C-alpha cells in the first residue's frame, strides 16, 4: 500500500476493515470524517466503488472512474 498510486475501495462488510481504511487514507482528504463522507457518497449506488488517484497532489477521489467527488480536503458534492 505504501507504493500504491491508485486504490479501488469496494463496499466493506466489516466495520473494522472500514475503520482501518479510513485510518490509512483519511489524512489524504483532510480528516477521517471527510474520507468517510467520500466513501458513503461513492457507495450510494449498488456495485459502485470509491476510486482514489494518489498520483496527483492533492489526491483525488472519484465515484467509479466517472465523477470526481473530492480533491485533497475539498468535498465536491
Model regions and ranges:
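Conserved ATP-driven motor cores of ASCE-family P-loop NTPases powering translocation/secretion/packaging/pilus
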Residues: 1-58
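Conserved P-loop NTPase motor module
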Residues: 46-77
Amino acid at each position: 500500500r505504501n507504493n500504491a498510486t491508485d486504490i479501488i475501495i469496494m463496499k466493506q462488510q466489516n466495520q473494522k476493515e472500514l475503520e482501518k481504511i479510513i485510518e490509512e487514507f483519511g489524512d489524504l482528504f483532510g480528516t477521517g470524517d471527510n474520507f468517510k463522507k467520500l466513501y458513503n457518497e461513492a457507495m450510494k449506488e449498488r456495485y459502485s466503488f470509491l476510486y482514489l488517484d494518489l498520483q496527483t497532489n492533492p489526491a483525488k477521489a472519484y465515484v467509479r472512474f466517472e465523477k470526481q467527488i473530492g480533491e485533497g480536503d475539498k468535498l465536491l458534492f
